[in-house]
A protein has these predicted regions:
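Active-site beta-alpha connecting loops in nucleotide-dependent enzymes
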Residues: 46-49, 324-326, 342-379
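Phosphate-binding loop of NTP-binding sites
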Residues: 90-225, 229-237
């Protein structure tokens, strides 16, 4: 992202105070501890802290300006600046993100689902990066704040942008899609994550299908054939539908467009499998842990093929992918293997993690699970 403070003021509907319109901002930052020269620091209000408190620290770190909702002074009462004064920081970020997305004009892949969004995002970023200049969401940036921040990572040479799209209520994914405008959409699965907010699995299905329904006629919907609720979303889109799934001998009405076969898992939980598309196949050994990662890899592979990549390129990208921190993160020291999957939890992901860990225990070994509370399940 590169834009002048004058452009930022015009796009966001804000007012520049104490700055030069031609000064260039090269990055958006919402954490003053990570501020660096050239940043536009956004002072967000929060439940535990107000970003306006940290404007001075961000400017001292070299930030080009701070986006605020009111004038800010230092401890001596002197006005701080440059400031970009806006009414609503989230609305301003959304406007800036939409503008940068339109200027960069990459191919945008949106990913949603109850579980597997971040892992699929990491796998797809690695796959697309084999051929394309690719930008992907950091960590789990998938809401009304994280999605604009992801868009603002792009530049004019970005070819593929991978976005996570989350929801805690009806209409949220549809709203995100109005300015993300994905051409490819992936739905990983439907489970009971955020059941408390939705009230029923049917409502969760409807929310996740908003991504598929938002795709253009020339787009591609990538759907999990192993989840009937996801496969059923084919009926709500004008886009081409490509399915993926595991071929484990169970009867099917139709073979997935892309399938995974002969899954095996090594001592550290890392799966290998055969990637099959029509008469072609490639052997793939993942660098991430968990048998469930094969489904995420198939989703990423299908999207990679939809981007025009070869099966060889896709396989190479899958093999070099690594997990985000705290997501089935495996470390080994002194004969003890620690699997850190503490970023978030829901019944589906916990069952997958426990299954992976149990399979890693050698004969005579022990398996200890440290489990926390799972929220937003409506129970």
């Amino acid at each position: 992202m590169k834009l002048t403070l004058g452009e930022a003021a015009r796009i966001s509907g804000g007012r520049l105070v104490g700055g030069t319109p031609g000064t260039e901002a090269t990055r958006v930052c919402v954490d003053s501890r990570r501020a660096r020269p050239g940043d536009l620091f956004v002072a967000l209000p929060g439940d535990f802290a107000d970003g306006h408190t940290f404007v001075e620290a961000a400017l001292r770190a070299g930030a080009a300006a701070a986006m605020v909702t009111r004038p800010v002074v230092d401890l001596a009462g002197a006005p701080l600046g440059p400031l970009l004064v806006v009414e609503d920081p989230l609305a301003a970020l959304r406007a800036l993100g939409a503008w940068v997305r339109d200027v960069a004009d990459p191919i945008v892949v949106g990913i949603t689902g109850s579980t597997g969004k971040t892992s699929t995002k990491d796998l797809l970023a690695s796959v697309a990066g084999v051929r394309f200049r690719t930008v992907a969401a950091e960590r789990s940036h998938n809401n009304e704040l994280g999605v604009p921040l992801t868009l603002l990572q792009t530049s004019e040479d970005t070819e593929v942008l991978v976005c996570e799209l989350g929801a805690r209520g009806p209409g949220q994914i549809r709203d995100l899609c109005t300015y993300v405008r994905p051409q490819i959409g992936i739905v990983t699965n439907v489970g009971v994550t955020h059941y408390e907010q939705f009230g029923s699995v049917d409502a969760i299905v409807a929310a996740k299908s908003e991504l598929v329904a938002s795709l253009p006629e020339g787009g591609v919907a990538v759907l999990n054939a192993d989840d009937p609720r996801v496969a059923g979303m084919a009926g709500v889109t004008a886009a081409e539908v490509l399915t993926y799934g595991l071929d484990e001998g169970a009867p099917r009405t139709a073979r997935p467009w892309l399938s995974g076969e002969a899954v095996e898992v090594d001592a550290l939980g890392r799966p290998s499998f055969r990637l099959v598309r029509g008469d072609e196949h490639r052997e793939v050994r993942l660098g991430v842990s968990g048998r469930h990662q094969v489904s995420n890899a198939l989703a990423a592979a299908t999207a990679g093929l939809a981007l025009g990549m070869s099966l060889d390129e896709v396989a190479a990208g899958l093999e070099r992918a690594r997990s985000s921190p705290w997501r089935m993160e495996v470390t080994e020291r002194g004969g003890v293997v620690v699997v850190n999957d503490a970023y978030n939890a829901n019944p589906t992901s916990v069952a997958a993690a426990l299954g992976t860990c149990a399979a890693m225990v050698p004969p005579g070994g022990r398996f200890l699970a440290v489990l926390g509370y799972m929220a937003e399940l409506g129970v």
